[in-house]
């Protein structure tokens, strides 16, 4: 398999001290596994995956300092030392005082979003673009998630901050229906729109609009460090700032926060809710006790709190972030140079293939992003994830409304794979699209869950044509 070399591949700023064997199953075996999984890559076993780019959430490698911190975990039910170290790390790195740990990000979304929807007695939640779990949480609590991506987000040409919210559309919504809006949400970085960063100017403008209409501004900050690094890289005004200072500046404009520590906490599990409102904090704390655990552990072991505390301090180190962003960019450059259409510029955690351009002949009703994900696994053993019609299409007035984007996401776990893994992925996908478009078979849904917004996780599919 030809691999296109790069003149400047990124150099890993770490040594490998422990390894996990991986193996590439024969194609016939991969086909059998795919059939058993209902042609849904979420349902595959990890031992049957050669290179796993399904998600960067909780799948990265921890540092020796995080492993050492695990051994100091205090497992007391209440008031554990590990809780105080976790709290202090959130304060020091992010500048947030009122924090509640939870077992992962979607628990934070469920508790915070549910409380805000009840308090405002309003349903609409505008966002730069909702990600799948947050969207599902809002839908299943009676809310209406509304995507207002930047006009530049859907354009192929590079633009530094495609993750922004469309301020003009947001302002128009607030002028017409502010009473129906529960809160404004910024997802940082904007995962669904290609892992793109949100600019500081956009955050400041949204803050002004929130103040003008008396609305809370909520931030999903699970990739706060990657966003801050990209601001430093793409906005000349912040070139001399540290990543930590940029992150704290951006976070200073928010009211309430959700965080999955499985991303920029560099941990395998965990998350938190934070707020600036003491009254809301008390109500959220009660919900955490009811649904997650006591307020000083929130469903996590003390050792997990220790790993997150250390991870939050490591994630703002610029040597780490430079390699993180450059490795993902390297994968993007390899794909683009071989003719694979991707969202540009490449964001912080993943490369997104524009499937509508890659497979223009396939109708949206055949779920092209997920069809490409299945074909990529079958032909190479690589697992990626489709983010398109299967995940985000909805029925409205008896008709199917398809999302603006149909993307294949190649999410790179942190500190886990090397450049040669990226080269294998790029060569495999480029070959599939160059030589084997006929191998990408459209899919139909055989079975799906009744709960809204999660069918791409659990659906069983089958090819429309024989494989």
UniProtKB/Swiss-Prot annotation:
Gene Ontology molecular functions: tryptophanase activity
Modified residues (N6-(pyridoxal phosphate)lysine): 263
Cofactor: pyridoxal 5'-phosphate
Pathway: Amino-acid degradation; L-tryptophan degradation via pyruvate pathway; indole and pyruvate from L-tryptophan: step 1/1
Keyword Iron set for record: no
InterPro entries membership: ArAA_b-elim_lyase/Thr_aldolase (IPR001597), Beta-eliminating_lyase (IPR011166), PyrdxlP-dep_Trfase (IPR015424), PyrdxlP-dep_Trfase_major (IPR015421), PyrdxlP-dep_Trfase_small (IPR015422), TNase (IPR013440), Tryptophanase_CS (IPR018176)
Pfam families referenced in this protein's UniProt entry, alphabetically: Beta_elim_lyase
Entry EC no(s): 4.1.99.1
Domain of life: Archaea
Enzyme class, UniProt record, top EC level: lyase
Entry keyword set: Lyase, Pyridoxal phosphate, Tryptophan catabolism
Gene3D superfamilies for this protein: Aspartate Aminotransferase, domain 1 (3.90.1150.10), Type I PLP-dependent aspartate aminotransferase-like (Major domain) (3.40.640.10)
Known catalytic reactions: L-tryptophan + H2O = indole + pyruvate + NH4(+)
Family: Belongs to the beta-eliminating lyase family.
NCBIfam families named in the record: PRK13238.1
Listed name of the protein: Probable tryptophanase
Organism (species): Aeropyrum pernix (strain ATCC 700893 / DSM 11879 / JCM 9820 / NBRC 100138 / K1)
């Amino acid at each position: 398999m030809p691999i296109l070399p790069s003149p400047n591949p990124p150099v890993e700023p770490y040594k490998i001290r422990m390894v996990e064997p991986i193996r590439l199953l024969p194609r016939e075996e991969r086909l059998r596994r795919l059939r058993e999984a209902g042609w849904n890559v979420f349902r595959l076993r990890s031992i049957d995956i050669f290179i796993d780019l399904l998600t960067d959430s909780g799948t990265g490698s921890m540092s020796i300092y995080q492993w050492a911190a695990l051994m100091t975990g205090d497992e007391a039910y209440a008031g554990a030392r590990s809780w105080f170290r976790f709290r202090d790390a959130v304060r020091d790195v992010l500048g947030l005082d009122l924090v509640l740990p939870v077992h992962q990000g979607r628990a934070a979304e469920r508790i915070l979003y549910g409380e805000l929807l009840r308090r405002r007695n309003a349903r609409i939640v505008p966002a730069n673009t909702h990600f799948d779990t947050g969207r599902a949480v809002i839908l299943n609590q009676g809310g209406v998630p509304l995507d207002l991506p930047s006009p530049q987000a859907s354009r192929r040409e590079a633009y530094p901050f495609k993750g922004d919210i469309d301020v003009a559309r947001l302002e128009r919504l607030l002028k017409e229906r502010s009473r129906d809006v529960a809160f404004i949400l910024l997802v940082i970085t904007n995962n669904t729109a290609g892992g793109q960063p949100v600019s500081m100017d956009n955050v400041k403008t949204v803050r002004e609009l929130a103040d003008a209409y008396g609305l809370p501004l909520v931030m999903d900050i699970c990739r706060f460090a990657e966003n801050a690094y990209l601001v430093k890289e793409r906005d000349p005004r912040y070139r001399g700032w540290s990543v930590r200072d940029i992150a704290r500046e951006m976070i200073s404009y928010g009211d309430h926060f959700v965080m999955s520590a499985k991303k920029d906490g560099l941990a395998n599990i965990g998350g938190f809710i934070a707020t600036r409102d003491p009254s809301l904090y008390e109500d959220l704390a009660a919900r955490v006790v009811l649904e997650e655990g006591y307020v000083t552990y929130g469903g996590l072991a003390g050792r997990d709190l220790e790993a997150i505390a250390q991870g939050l301090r490591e994630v703002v180190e610029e040597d780490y972030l430079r390699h993180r962003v450059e490795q993902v960019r390297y994968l993007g450059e390899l794909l683009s140079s071989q003719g694979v259409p991707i969202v540009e510029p490449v964001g912080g955690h993943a490369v997104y293939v524009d499937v509508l351009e890659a497979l223009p002949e396939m109708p949206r009703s055949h779920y092209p992003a997920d069809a490409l994900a299945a074909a990529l696994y079958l032909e190479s053993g690589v697992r990626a994830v489709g983010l398109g019609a299967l995940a985000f299409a909805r029925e409205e007035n008896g008709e199917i409304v398809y999302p603006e984007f149909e993307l294949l996401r190649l999410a790179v776990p942190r500190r886990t794979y090397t450049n040669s893994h990226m080269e294998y992925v790029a060569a495999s996908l480029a070959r599939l699209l160059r030589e084997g478009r006929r191998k990408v078979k459209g899919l139909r849904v055989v079975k799906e869950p009744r709960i809204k917004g999660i069918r791409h996780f659990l659906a069983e599919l089958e090819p429309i044509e024989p494989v």
